[in-house]
Design a protein with these regions (language model features):
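Preference for long, amphipathic alpha-helical scaffolds in soluble/luminal domains
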Residues: 1-312
Length: 312
């Protein structure tokens, strides 16, 4: 494990270094130290590369605001930046978020999907909330209204999706769970806690590795390919990581089998590789496909340690 951690905290990927220090090693950093780490993230690729493509008006790709085209426009760049560790303290990021809020959020707090798919799809609502929370918008009304909308729609529909013939959608449940995990327990109201419980119950009620969630179509091969960053789809690693962040432990047999599956994909040198990539679809590539991945290795190692799956 020491060799793997040493690799993860190398200077060439300040984002993974930051998350490894804070989420795996649990190092307590004061504000000054955290600010320095965040500055490193901001000044290095791929964050700096994404920021360099931003137009003066605050947008990317085109001055239109929606979830389409996938992975190219303003929403997606800000979403990727949030995953990489950027925050609202970056003026240009805050400027872009204000454009997204002004042009995409409905009066109900939701972020409707248009174009090829339509409606308040739960996967995109979860991703948007995760983005806002990661960037540091915890207290803003636009965040709380989205969180409330998600809790209400989950209470009514329980993760059902019209594009899954009204069956419950595990991808949507994972995206929502990832977002709500970011809210400190002491700041969760009963609706947030109930939504987390519903997501956990649904995801664990079906075999994660077999992916035997209700469906009409064949299961997606994406479920078995570890990837970062993910779009609206999900995989076994992201699902397992979200459940563990929600407090689930390896004593659960379903989760333990998923952890075993993740462990079986470990390379001989103790790392994990990127098995699917959005490179070529995004404006800026992140790592390399079919090569050892610091991001995939970070999520796998964090899942093992937090779940107490095994001594590494």
């Amino acid at each position: 494990m020491k060799k793997l951690i040493k690799w993860l905290i190398e200077e060439d990927n300040p984002s993974v270094k930051f998350y490894t220090l804070t989420e795996i090693l649990n190092e307590k950093t004061d504000k000054g130290a955290e600010d320095l780490l965040r500055k490193d993230i901001e000044s290095c690729a791929p964050v700096s590369s994404i920021m360099a493509l931003q137009e003066n008006g605050g947008w990317w790709h085109e001055d239109k605001y929606s979830f389409s085209p996938l992975y190219k426009n303003t929403f997606w760049q800000v979403y990727f930046l949030s995953l990489l560790g950027a925050t609202k303290q970056i003026f240009a990021v805050d400027k872009a978020v204000k454009l997204i809020i002004a042009n995409m959020q409905s009066e109900k707090g939701a972020f409707p999907v248009h174009d090829r798919y339509t409606g308040n799809l739960i996967c995109f609502q979860g991703m948007t909330l995760e983005m806002l929370l990661r960037l540091g918008y915890f207290e803003e009304n636009f965040t709380s209204s989205l969180s409330a909308f998600i809790s209400d729609i989950v209470y009514r529909n329980d993760f059902r999706c019209k594009y899954r013939a009204q069956f419950k959608c595990p991808w949507g449940a994972v995206k929502v769970l990832k977002a709500l995990n970011l809210i400190p327990p002491e700041k969760r109201d009963h609706k947030v806690s109930d939504t987390i419980s519903r997501a956990v119950k649904f995801l664990l009620s079906h075999d994660i590795v077999e992916a035997n969630y209700p469906r009409k179509k064949m299961k997606s091969r994406q479920w078995y390919l570890f990837s970062f960053p993910r779009g609206f789809q999900s995989d076994i690693l992201e699902t397992t990581s979200a459940l563990i962040d929600a407090g689930c432990k390896s004593q659960n047999s379903n989760l333990r089998n998923a952890l075993k599956y993740i462990n079986e994909k470990r390379l001989d040198d103790g790392k994990w590789k990127m098995e699917y990539s959005l490179n070529g679809k995004m404006l800026v590539d992140i790592e390399k496909n079919n090569k050892p991945s610091k991001w995939i290795s970070y999520f796998a190692l964090k899942s093992f340690i937090k779940s107490k799956f095994r001594s590494i």
